[in-house]
A protein has these predicted regions:
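SDR active-site strand-loop-helix element
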Residues: 6, 30, 72-75, 112-118, ...
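NAD(P)-dependent short-chain dehydrogenase/reductase
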Residues: 126, 139, 147, 151-202, ...
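Conserved catalytic-core motifs of eukaryotic protein kinase domains, centered on the activation segment
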Residues: 39-41, 82-89, 123-127, 172-173
């Protein structure tokens, strides 16, 4: 299959593109390389890879590279609430307008597999699992834009949307602003963290399992199409406090406490059911403890927090 991946050198794309190539697909990897990342260099030997430096909002560029592909995976995104708040215009043009443009330019036969976020659930009911039928209630611009474009995607047909849990794990284009990655980094470098809203819960998924999900969708597209799917670890609906307790099992000297004053601007608090995608045969490979162990090793290499989106 010929696949166009936008944002291909980002945190997810840097894991996904090699997996697509290993599976025999031909990949056009488009990225602006705004972080000067070299995360796809190791793939350049592969004749099935073409790398394009450019902006996913460039209509002429997208038209050109859409011509001969079977599938599009639009990863180009200003990811996370803080970054979207810093650049709301860039957030809308990248996270909404650019994806809508792909839908308008593609042929009806070309499929789209799109990563949205389970952040769209916002604040859930205590003790009630959010399913794909749960009304979306985003609490940030990032979440709202993802929810809006998902609605457009599903109405356009011939697509799958993936409501990804909070990602974690090592990637060649590393990010330390993700919660598990951040807390583990603090544990091994600072030895402590002060928590705000420590009881707020969310779901987690390893970046390699996110890549696996895209491959699963490509292989099972006909039976999965035109539906949203939650993607996360069913045994990892954890509060910040519970996450720190998991990290402490591997970093015994890690100290964490909840602040009695102040609050976290991130108000997300929900638990998620991943039963729908599991019924299609998908099963994550990497547990949260395995991911934490991986991060601890990785942070022996990374010594400064230069890997964030803001």
């Amino acid at each position: 299959m010929k696949i166009l991946v936008t944002g291909a050198a980002g945190y997810i794309g840097s894991i996904l593109v090699p997996r697509l190539l290993q599976s025999g697909h031909k990949v056009t990897a488009l990225d602006s390389f705004i972080y000067n990342q070299s995360s796809l260099l190791d793939c350049c030997y592969d004749n099935n890879l073409d790398i394009v430096r450019g902006d996913a909002r460039d209509k002429g560029l997208i038209q050109l590279y859409l011509k001969d592909v079977d599938a599009v995976i639009p990863l180009a995104c200003l990811t996370g609430a803080p970054l979207c708040d810093v650049d709301p215009v860039g957030a809308r043009t990248t996270n909404f307008d650019a994806v809508k443009m792909i839908l308008e330019l593609r042929s009806r036969e070309q499929i789209v597999i799109f990563p949205t976020t389970n952040s769209g659930y916002g604040v859930g009911q205590k003790g009630v699992y959010c399913t794909e039928e749960t009304p979306l209630n985003p609490v940030s611009l990032y979440g709202r834009l993802k929810a809006e474009i998902e609605k457009v995607l599903l109405s356009s047909g011939n697509c799958i949307t993936l409501r990804l849990a909070t990602a974690f794990g090592i990637s060649p284009r590393m990010r330390l602003d993700l919660l598990v990655n951040d807390f583990t980094y603090r544990a091994v470098t600072d030895g402590f963290v002060v928590l705000f809203e420590a009881r707020f819960k969310r779901n987690y998924i390893h970046v390699r399992d996110i890549a696996k999900t895209f491959l699963h969708c490509l292989e099972n597209f006909d039976k999965m199409k035109n539906e949203p799917y939650n993607v996360g670890l069913s045994d990892a609906n954890l509060s910040k406090m519970e996450l720190c307790e998991e990290i402490k099992k591997q970093v015994p000297g890690f100290y964490f406490t909840e602040s009695e004053i102040g609050e976290d601007p991130d108000k997300r608090d929900y638990i998620v059911s991943n039963a729908k995608i599991e019924k299609t045969g998908f099963k994550p490979d990497i547990s949260l403890p395995q991911g934490i162990a991986e991060l601890i090793k990785g942070y022996r290499v990374i010594r400064k927090n230069q890997y964030s989106n803001v």
